Amino acid sequence: MNQKTLKIMEYERIKQALRGYLVSAAGQHELAELAPTADAKQLQIWLDESRDGADIYRLENGIPLPKLDDIRPHLHRLAMEAALNGLELAQISRVLWTTSSVVKFFRDLTEKEITLRRLDRVVKELVTLPDVTRRLRTSLEGDGHITDEASPALRQIRQHIAQTEVAIRQTMDQYTRGKDAKYLSETIVTIRDERYVIPVRAEYKQRFGGIVHDQSASGQTLFIEPQAVVGLNNRLRQNQIDERHEEQRILAELTALLDPYQAEILRNSEILGHFDFINAKAKYAHQLKATEPKLSEDNQVNLRQARHPLIDPKKVVANDITIGRDYKTIIVTGPNTGGKTITLKTLALVQLMGQSGLFIPANENSVIGIFDDIFADIGDEQSIEQSLSTFSGHMENIVAILRQADERSLIVVDELGAGTDPQEGAALAIAILDQMGTLGSYVMASTHYPELKAYGYNRPETINASMEFDGETLQPTYHLLIGIPGRSNALDIAARLGMPEQVVAAARGLTDQDSQDLNAMISDLTEQKRHADADAERLRQELAEADELHAQLKKQFDAYQHQKDQLMTDAKREANRLVDESRKRANQIISDLRKKQLAAGKSVVKEDELIAAQGALNALQQDSKLKKNRVLRREKAKLDFHKGDSVLVKSYGQVGVLMEQLDDQHWEVQLGILKMKIATNDLEKAQDPAKSAKQPRASVKRSGSSGMSATLDLRGHRYEEAMAEVDRYIDSALLAGYPSVTIIHGKGTGALRKGVTDYLKRNNRIKSFGFSPANAGGDGSTVVHFK
């Protein structure tokens, strides 16, 4: 990207603002390398990371990072096989500990179901070294001091040092607080040559004996190590030497521990610096109220309410700036001091920020282009030493731009053609704009030449623009009006400031009538646009409010639906629980009744009534899956039942025939010999009995008409099995509606025959029974007739 443009646009001030949010040396290094890119893929990656950073800052107040020092020199020394000192190791330890913390932080984000675009993949590049981290943090404090936990030997040595120092002070206290205190210059204990001494008056030095280590400048005081503490001081000195050796051994051990992981530690430091940089971008975006820009590889720029990021937010004026879709050149005309220069800088600087992966100070859904280069000629950039005139310097810049620009360049030029004869300046400006158009560049240029107003109408892909001027206050509003050329307000301002009316009138008379008409037309257009913009803004706000209301109502409706479904599901679950309990009790009662009935030899309750009651109980069961119930209801509503249809009664598990529709919700169904009232939603169409497939069983032949055979063959069964089968068969035959059935028991020993006869005698549902005719089996089978 053009370095001169970065300087003109004060891009470095943007980086300086970001620098204030950084806490790591690695983040500072990344910021130093920050520059706009024209690589669309790389730019999208940067913006995705900025989006993640903004979301994390909004939800979690950013990625938690402490102050991290530059560890690259330490790793370089490590590569040279040099032992690291305590502070260097502590700084590396902080990087490793932060690595573990950040990995856990992102793991927690995943558990909270916070969706990220990219950083969840970046964090996977971090390598945690838990054992190494634990050893370093146990052995070192933040300032590099080695802790007592670094080794048992070090702890023991330091205990000895502490004990010896206590013994020395106790001995010294005898001198400073006892009867010998009067021989001291001061009643204190001090240190000389790393040994404890007391300040003794020179004339009493023989009283204490020991070793003289120093004397005062006057010679009146001698610093003496009394003989009584010489041995203790010697022991302390040796302990201190042992401590230093043990500390050096520990530092060498910790250094060796890091050696295999140099590359991983360096990469961790870089990634943490990258996260720090992303944090800084998010915080700066929050300060600016900046938003994520959309990218247009076709360079169709649409900045919605863009603001210059370096102007006080309370004073800056936002503007809509659009270029690249319907037009590629904007000519901003009108007098100076209207805000033209700031508008040009806003376009260029916002574009530079966006192409650097930063959020931009503009409203949501703003679009930036991806320009290969951005050129600018704004203000007087010439050096005094070169003694170039304003016009010469201006032309020199334009020449350089024309040599480098192409169809993927954005050019912003302030006061094009200024600094020379107006007529020649205007002609030159038009020719330069034509050349820029030929190159295919995107151009936003300001000028005060009225001749360029016509240029904006006559050239393709070119549009006029101006800075709004308030006719009431005679002050610029600094709002950009695209599509409306600028007009002169000199005469109006002069009149408002008190210029004599005859002077103003004379001036108007000297002004070309066409110019006056044009200014009047521009004034009308400006007023109409102001009203149109106000209406558009009002409609935008109303639409936004409507969208928000719609979203709230939808959310409330969804919550209501969920609550309703949940209540229904809970109610059905509770109903099913009650039905299950009732079914168990009913089944137990039915079982007890059957046992009593068989024991008494007669039936107090008809078996078909018991079966019907059990089926009705089963029908109370509800499907707890509400959505499934709805589907079933819709499907059942589609069924078209008719009298005479074969149907399956789901609650009974039996096939019957529709006899008559009793009402909208119920049918009378013939189930064997029974006619029952059945709910419509308990019915399903069944296959025509005549077409149903036969399903043979070993000893019972299924008939096509009723689903069971009219003959029961007990031959080959043991007595107990046969009696149980007879009991089940009689129940089924009654339910199926058979008037009579045949039970084949064979002749054999006669045991089965006698058992069947005894059972039939006890069953009061049997009208009569007897042996089959001789030609149909004789006394080897029994024909049973039901009531």
Curated annotation (Swiss-Prot):
Gene3D superfamilies: 3.30.1370.110, P-loop containing nucleotide triphosphate hydrolases. Residues 685-709 are annotated as: Disordered. GO terms for biological process: mismatch repair; negative regulation of DNA recombination; rescue of stalled ribosome. Its EC number is 3.1.-.-, 3.6.4.-. Keywords: ATP-binding, DNA-binding, Endonuclease, Hydrolase, Nuclease, Nucleotide-binding, RNA-binding, rRNA-binding. It is an enzyme of class 3 (hydrolase). Pfam families: MSSS (PF20297), MutS_V (PF00488), Smr (PF01713). One of its GO terms (molecular function) is ATP hydrolysis activity. ATP binds at G334, P335, N336, T337, G338, G339, K340, T341. It comes from the Bacteria. Residues 712-787 form the Smr domain. Endonuclease that is involved in the suppression of homologous recombination and thus may have a key role in the control of bacterial genetic diversity. Homodimer. Binds to stalled ribosomes, contacting rRNA. HAMAP family: MutS2. Belongs to the DNA mismatch repair MutS family. MutS2 subfamily. This is Endonuclease MutS2. It comes from Levilactobacillus brevis (strain ATCC 367 / BCRC 12310 / CIP 105137 / JCM 1170 / LMG 11437 / NCIMB 947 / NCTC 947) (Lactobacillus brevis). The lineage of its organism: Bacteria, Bacillati, Bacillota, Bacilli, Lactobacillales.
